Amino acid sequence: MSDNSIEEKVRSIIVDQLGVESDKVTADAKFIEDLGADSLDTVELVMAFEENFDIEVPDEEAEKLQSVADVVAYIEKVQG
């Protein structure tokens, strides 16, 4: 999967999960600070990423995923 399609899919998941407008979901947007997510939202986001990308995100890694760019980089790393 190309970088752009990963980012597009991540952005789409965030829009669906958080109910935010797509133009607010930028690469640097932080889930809690910029997109209004709470801790439950972030858990649900990680679960959605795991399901949609067929990956497993350990809790210690999930805590590091705070922005769109963080998630895209992590998915690229684990999908090799």
From Swiss-Prot:
Alphabetically ordered keywords of this record: Cytoplasm, Fatty acid biosynthesis, Fatty acid metabolism, Lipid biosynthesis, Lipid metabolism, Phosphopantetheine, Phosphoprotein
GO cellular component, one term: membrane
O-(pantetheine 4'-phosphoryl)serine found at: 39
PTM summary: 4'-phosphopantetheine is transferred from CoA to a specific serine of apo-ACP by AcpS. This modification is essential for activity because fatty acids are bound in thioester linkage to the sulfhydryl of the prosthetic group.
Compartments (UniProt record): Cytoplasm
Main location: cytoplasm
Superkingdom of origin: Bacteria
Gene Ontology MF term list: acyl binding; acyl carrier activity
Domain Carrier: 4-79
GO biological process, one term: lipid A biosynthetic process
NCBIfam families: acyl_carrier, PRK00982.1-2, PRK00982.1-3, PRK00982.1-4, PRK00982.1-5
Sequence similarity: Belongs to the acyl carrier protein (ACP) family.
Protein name as annotated: Acyl carrier protein
Biological source species: Akkermansia muciniphila (strain ATCC BAA-835 / DSM 22959 / JCM 33894 / BCRC 81048 / CCUG 64013 / CIP 107961 / Muc)
Gene: acpP
